[in-house]
């Protein structure tokens, strides 16, 4: 209770619910509005002694941005410096349900290789194209500070929330499909189709390098009102 967490905006809105339900506060640091990459000047300014954790989502929901190795290295260096200055670890929670849904050639950086105090959250539901079927894991790297205690805390948190075991059927599915993915070419085709159409109609939209979202700029200041009007055309949009 009372701890602060940072994340990059725009972000998956349930992050705020997760943090606040545990008595913490979530501060969103706006990304660079042109490419949605981390604005390191703003991020460093927000990284106060109250911050105990950072939530990172790459590939990102909702922008589709992917953070490069250079970005992860820079973030790791900053968190290492601030952890030493403040006298406590700043945990990096790397939320990676879209890890396999990428449209670039180079592999995604494995975050624990750059920053020891990283917790990796993964879900099979996206890579297998089974959204809604919640099965995955939280990885606590052995090199993390007090790794055994943190591992026990993660297990205890799941039990406290009522999640003792994943559904038995999907435990078998995950085991049988290890190393497999759905056809990623379908996602790329849909991305290109929608992105090209939006740009032809005059919308500004950064090209997603991962996940299955588009985050176009609304043609008017009130994004919420724009999304409400879109419902008349059976379009479900989320303002950001």
Question: Where on the chain are the PLM-derived regions?
Answer:
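PLP-dependent class I/II
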Residues: 1-240
């Amino acid at each position: 209770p009372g701890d602060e967490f940072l994340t990059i905006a725009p972000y998956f809105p349930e992050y705020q619910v997760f943090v606040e339900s545990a008595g913490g506060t979530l501060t969103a640091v706006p990304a660079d509005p042109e490419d949605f990459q981390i604005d390191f000047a703003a991020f460093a300014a927000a990284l106060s002694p109250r911050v105990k954790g950072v939530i990172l989502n790459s590939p990102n929901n909702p922008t589709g941005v992917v953070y490069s190795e250079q970005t992860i290295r820079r973030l790791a260096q900053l968190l290492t410096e601030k952890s030493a200055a403040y006298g406590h670890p700043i945990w990096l929670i790397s939320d990676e349900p879209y890890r396999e849904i990428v449209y670039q050639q180079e592999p995604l950086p494995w975050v624990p290789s750059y920053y020891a105090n990283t917790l990796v959250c993964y879900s099979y539901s996206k890579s297998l194209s089974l959204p809604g079927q919640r099965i995955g894991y939280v990885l606590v790297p052995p090199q993390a500070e007090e790794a055994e205690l943190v591992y026990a805390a993660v297990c205890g948190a799941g039990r406290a929330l009522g999640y003792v075991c994943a559904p038995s059927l999907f435990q078998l599915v995950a085991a049988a499909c290890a190393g497999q993915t759905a056809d990623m070419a379908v996602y790329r085709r849909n991305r290109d189709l929608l992105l090209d159409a939006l740009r032809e109609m005059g919308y500004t939209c950064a090209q997603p390098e991962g996940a299955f979202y588009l985050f176009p700029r609304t043609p008017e200041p009130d994004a919420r009102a724009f999304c409400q009007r879109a419902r008349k055309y059976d379009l479900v949009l989320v303002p950001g």
